[in-house]
Each structure stands twice: as C-alpha cells, then as structure tokens.
Amino acid sequence: MAQLLQGSTLVLSDDSKVQAESHLSNKIVALYFSAGWCPPCRNFTPKLKRFYEVVKKAGKNFEVVFVSRDRAAEDLVEYYKDHHGEWTYLEFGDPHIQEFLEKYEIKTIPALKVIKPDGTVVVNDARTEVVDKGAENPLALFEEWEAFYES
C-alpha cells in the first residue's frame, strides 16, 4: 500500500492520525467511495460496517479507507461518526481523492474496490459482493478476496 498512498495521513475512528504506509502494511485494503448526501450510500454503509466487524472480529488483516465525496469537511466527519465502522478515512481535500476517482473510474457512488498495495484492483465491484455474498457469510467472501489478493 506504500506506493498508492505514499505520504498520506489517515484518520482513525478515535480522531488520531496515522501514516497510511505503516497502517495499511500487510492488510487487504478496500477503498470505499461514499457520501452522506447519497441515499444509496447511507443504505450500503451499514452492510459494509457489519461485514467489516465480522471480518475484523475473526482476526483478519483488513482495512477500509473511506474516500469521501462529501462537499464539506463537516459533512464528512458527521457522516463518518454517525454511520461508519471503525475504519480509516482520507482527510477532506486530500489530493489522493481526485487521483483515485480518475484511476478507478468512479462515476457513481457508493463504490467499493479491493486493491493491492500497488493499486491494482483485485475486486472491482466489491459493493455488490458484500450485498449479495457478504450478508450470509462474510468470512467466506473475505477468504475469496484473500485468494485473489495472493494470486
């Protein structure tokens, strides 16, 4: 993950900040593009939160990075605090946000992409997978992602 988010700061659920390179090292990472003003996002976020909690409770090395499409920093923080899991987010205005929107061709939200450290997409439509497969058996889905990640 060092190459993709080099020099970036991530915010944790307790408001502390960490360097992306060290925090994401040796983890399977999903970029979550979402916004509080988006009804489909507010519908999907609790599903992702449940998936994340089950996977983390099982001791898996998994991290979600919230890439906000909110229009103001206050909106980002409010949406994150009220609805998201205990994952990380890029600070409002981080230059990587625009880079990721272009690189991953994000046209609509919510979008969830599982990526390798070099930025290669492992699972392009992870959102649909979380909704369709992750609701019944989150760990089985995550193990599929692990297999893709290692190949």
State where each predicted segment sits.
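Plant-skewed but cross-kingdom recognition/interaction modules and surfaces
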Residues: D14-H23, H83-E91, Y104
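Short pre-active-site segment immediately N-terminal to redox-active cysteine/selenocysteine motifs
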Residues: K27, S34-W37, T108
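Short coil/turn segments at secondary-structure boundaries
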Residues: F44-P46, E78-K81, E102-K103, A126-T128
